[in-house]
Regions:
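Sec-dependent N-terminal signal peptides of Gram-positive bacterial secreted proteins and lipoproteins
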Residues: 4-22
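N-terminal leader/targeting segments and the immediate start of mature chains
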Residues: 16-64, 203-218
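Short, solvent-exposed coil/turn segments at beta-strand boundaries
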Residues: 38-45, 60-69, 81-87, 138, ...
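Hydrophobic lipid-interacting interfaces of membrane-associated proteins
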Residues: 49-55, 93-94, 184-188
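An acidic-aromatic
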Residues: 55-117
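Gly/Pro-enriched, hydrophobic low-complexity segments
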Residues: 74-75, 138-217
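Short amphipathic beta-strand and strand-loop transition segments with alternating hydrophobic
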Residues: 127-136, 183
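Secondary-structure capping and domain/repeat boundary segments
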Residues: 218-290
Length: 290
């Protein structure tokens, strides 16, 4: 009987150790599993909150259709809401509805959305950290890592001298449940950031307000954009944009000195985005190098 009990205890210890044992995992696995596209194959949304000193200071909400980023501030909040077609930006007293343009016509904000991706918010360069340990328990994997020497050298200009991280992952999917980040700076200041991830979360309140507003026809105005007017490259596109918001046109820095905006076909009246934000609008875009 004693042998049976002893064997049972030994078996229990073995199973416990196995359940809490080391696990092989790479940062590349974590990085790949937490790409926005990968996460949204299994979830309708990804909601990421960064907390420091007990207060949320950054929110990211992602779906297949849009990316939302909100940062509360002492004097004013900062918010961006990006779809493939447009981007809302709230900073200070200005709320701007941007569209992206190129010399060849209208572009999209695919790159803007990528910058607010889950991988960008949750984990950076897969080669920028070194895993020190990884263990598995109760269906979760806990990974301890530190910045690589190269990453520390790259971050020297902002004063970071060291950093360590703790990832808590779903053992099956490798999806990040939480991330704790500890940064030490050359002035002796330490920053402790806790990142929590919620999958299939409800839409944040401010974003609900934006979506509800733009879904009401009476809140929209027609904006017609005529690119390269009077040339063989002329292109016209009409979109609906929210009333009350400044209508902005965004373009690459490389073409900044070659583009002009007007409100008449003869390209004599310069476009003033603050002039009237409630009525229908036509903007003529003249590219001076085409």
């Amino acid at each position: 009987m004693k042998k049976i009990v002893a064997f049972a205890l030994l078996l229990c210890m073995v199973l416990t150790l196995a359940a809490c044992g080391k696990v092989e995992i790479t940062l590349q696995e974590i990085y790949d599993a937490n790409q926005t596209e990968a996460l949204l194959k299994n979830h309708k949304s990804v909601y990421i909150q960064d907390e420091m000193d007990g207060e949320v200071w950054n929110e990211v909400y992602l779906t297949k259709e849009y990316a939302y980023n909100y940062i509360p501030g002492e004097d004013s909040d900062w918010m961006e809401f990006t779809t493939d077609d447009a981007r809302y930006s709230l900073a200070g007293d200005d709320c701007v509805y941007y569209v992206y343009i190129t010399p060849d016509g209208m572009g999209d904000f695919a790159n803007e959305r990528a910058e607010r991706s889950a991988s960008a918010a949750l984990c950076g360069d897969a080669e920028g950290e070194i895993i020190e340990s990884a263990s598995k328990k109760d269906g979760l994997i806990t990974v301890q890592s530190v910045l690589s020497q190269k990453a520390i050298e790259d971050m020297a200009e902002v004063g970071v001298t060291s950093a360590k991280f703790e990832y808590v992952l779903d053992a099956k999917t490798r999806e990040i449940i939480s991330l704790t980040s500890d940064y030490t700076y050359d002035d002796g200041v330490d920053f402790h950031v806790i990142t929590e991830v919620t999958y299939d979360a409800d839409v944040p309140e401010m974003l609900q307000t934006i979506l509800a507003y733009e879904n009401q026809t009476e809140n929209l105005r027609n904006v017609t954009i005529v690119s390269n007017p009077g040339t063989e490259k002329e292109e016209t596109k009409t979109i609906q944009a929210p009333k009350g918001l400044i209508f902005g046109l965004e373009f690459d820095d490389a073409v900044a000195e070659t583009v002009e905006f007007y409100t008449d076909a003869a390209c004599t009246e310069a476009y003033d985005p603050y002039a009237d934000t409630d009525t229908d609008l036509t903007i003529y875009i003249k590219w001076t190098n085409t």
